[in-house]
Amino acid sequence: MEWSTLTTIFDTSLAVVFTWVAYKTGQIIWKYTPYSYPNARIRAMEARLLTDQRFSELAESKSLQNFVVSLEDTDYGKRLTSLQSYNIEDVERALDLSLVDVIELMVKIMPKRIKGLFEIMLEEWDVRNIINVVKAKLSNMPPQDFIMPAGKMLQKVKAMAEAKTMEEMLVILEGTDYEEPLRRLLLNEITLQEFELELYKVHYSKLLRYVNSRKGEEKIIASEFVNMLIDYTNISTLLRAKLSSLAQEDIRKLIIPGGTLSKSTIEAMINSEDVVMALGELEGTKYGEVLREVREAVESGNIESVEIALRKYILRRMKELSQFYPLSVAVAVAYLLQKESEVRKLKAIAKLIEDGVKPEKIKEMVGELA
């Protein structure tokens, strides 16, 4: 074989190798680089999460005003320092809005290919606001008092609050995913509880469609997260329905499509004799081990213990994924879950202080939350 031929073959081989290396390098850069800045920022935010010692100190607050002042040097300071008064409703709203601020930040800093997850998560506030406005209207209460300034449809929600009739509210929602449930409510085809459920079904279906349209690690992580949220909601709803002795057919209407639980497991829970038997049907699922620990609490009618155990499980799982995929959306989701837990604890402390509960009891009660 001539030397020129060998050179040509060698050059061609090198070109193929370099092209492959460039392609793989490009893939790695596309896959991981967009997460470098946001995840570094989130890790810094994680360092500012409140410690158990800080929660203990907050529980010692003599009043709501002391509680608020103690949080002024934290990430909650921005919202809390703007309060005009120190009543529990305003404090809770400020804490909720601090959580909204975090989700909005995720929308801004996360890669375009996954930011839609957080945009849809913000839409849950649209669902809450619409439900609150409708309930207020039907109860002849001022709907403006129940609107949280959050979500993507805030202007429509405010217009609904100003509407003089329910029919006007329906016109305002025309063309949205929430128009049909409200129409059915006005025609008395569904109850107010079913209307609320329909809106949440719309919300979770949006989340599912979005995560299922992702690729690679984003799909793996986001899909597991959303399906666990649906499992959490279905388990909580089903157990509470069982505790209230709701008819099996009525319970079936409450189940949100999706999740990791099989149809046979859901059906077995629905057909079970009581709430403890329903809980037992989860023994063979991934939630079986953590729920086994709260069986006694459920026997006494404490469904909140199940919800706490499930929230802890979901957070632990997302933390595991954030360690396995350090440059991924798992870091943001795990942080958001920690922030939700923190806000939940702060709201509980604030309410207990308002109710005059002793500090030691507050520490005990809040320590059990997640």
Swiss-Prot record:
One of its GO terms (cellular component) is proton-transporting V-type ATPase, V0 domain. It is found in: Cell membrane. GO terms for biological process: proton motive force-driven plasma membrane ATP synthesis. Keywords: ATP synthesis, Cell membrane, Hydrogen ion transport, Ion transport, Membrane, Transport. InterPro entries: ATPase_csu/dsu_sf (IPR036079), ATPase_V0-cplx_csu (IPR014272), ATPase_V0-cplx_csu/dsu (IPR002843), V-ATPase_V0D/AC39_subunit (IPR050873), V-type_ATPase_csu/dsu (IPR035067), V-type_ATPase_csu/dsu_dom_3 (IPR044911). The keyword Thylakoid does not apply. It is a peripheral membrane protein. It comes from the Archaea. GO terms for molecular function: ATP binding; proton-transporting ATP synthase activity, rotational mechanism; proton-transporting ATPase activity, rotational mechanism. Disulfide bonds: none annotated. Its main location: membrane. Belongs to the V-ATPase V0D/AC39 subunit family. HAMAP family: ATP_synth_C_arch. Has multiple subunits with at least A(3), B(3), C, D, E, F, H, I and proteolipid K(x). Component of the A-type ATP synthase that produces ATP from ADP in the presence of a proton gradient across the membrane. This is A-type ATP synthase subunit C.
